């Protein structure tokens, strides 16, 4: 149904994207917790 290369790229990018969003949110949380606005 889907090309193996395309499915491989999607399966490879999804965890990286989720991890990137998690790390970004964590860094923003730490930055907001340590610094005053």
Swiss-Prot record:
<protein>
    <recommendedName>
        <fullName>Cytochrome b6-f complex subunit 5</fullName>
    </recommendedName>
</protein>
<dbReference type="Pfam" id="PF02529">
    <property type="entry name" value="PetG"/>
</dbReference>
<keyword id="KW-1133">Transmembrane helix</keyword>
<keyword id="KW-0150">Chloroplast</keyword>
<keyword id="KW-0249">Electron transport</keyword>
<keyword id="KW-0813">Transport</keyword>
<keyword id="KW-0793">Thylakoid</keyword>
<keyword id="KW-0472">Membrane</keyword>
<feature type="transmembrane region" description="Helical">
    <location>
        <begin position="5"/>
        <end position="25"/>
    </location>
</feature>
<dbReference type="GO" id="GO:0015979">
    <property type="term" value="P:photosynthesis"/>
</dbReference>
<comment type="subunit">
    <text>The 4 large subunits of the cytochrome b6-f complex are cytochrome b6, subunit IV (17 kDa polypeptide, PetD), cytochrome f and the Rieske protein, while the 4 small subunits are PetG, PetL, PetM and PetN. The complex functions as a dimer.</text>
</comment>
<comment type="function">
    <text>Component of the cytochrome b6-f complex, which mediates electron transfer between photosystem II (PSII) and photosystem I (PSI), cyclic electron flow around PSI, and state transitions. PetG is required for either the stability or assembly of the cytochrome b6-f complex.</text>
</comment>
<dbReference type="InterPro" id="IPR036099">
    <property type="entry name" value="Cyt_6/f_cplx_su5_sf"/>
</dbReference>
<keyword id="KW-0934">Plastid</keyword>
<dbReference type="GO" id="GO:0009535">
    <property type="term" value="C:chloroplast thylakoid membrane"/>
</dbReference>
<dbReference type="InterPro" id="IPR003683">
    <property type="entry name" value="Cyt_6/f_cplx_su5"/>
</dbReference>
<keyword id="KW-0602">Photosynthesis</keyword>
<dbReference type="GO" id="GO:0045158">
    <property type="term" value="F:electron transporter, transferring electrons within cytochrome b6/f complex of photosystem II activity"/>
</dbReference>
<dbReference type="GO" id="GO:0009512">
    <property type="term" value="C:cytochrome b6f complex"/>
</dbReference>
<comment type="similarity">
    <text>Belongs to the PetG family.</text>
</comment>
<dbReference type="GO" id="GO:0017004">
    <property type="term" value="P:cytochrome complex assembly"/>
</dbReference>
<keyword id="KW-0812">Transmembrane</keyword>
């Amino acid at each position: 149904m889907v090309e193996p290369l395309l499915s491989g790229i999607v399966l490879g990018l999804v965890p990286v994207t989720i991890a990137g969003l998690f790390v970004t949110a964590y860094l923003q949380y730490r930055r907001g917790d340590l610094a005053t606005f």
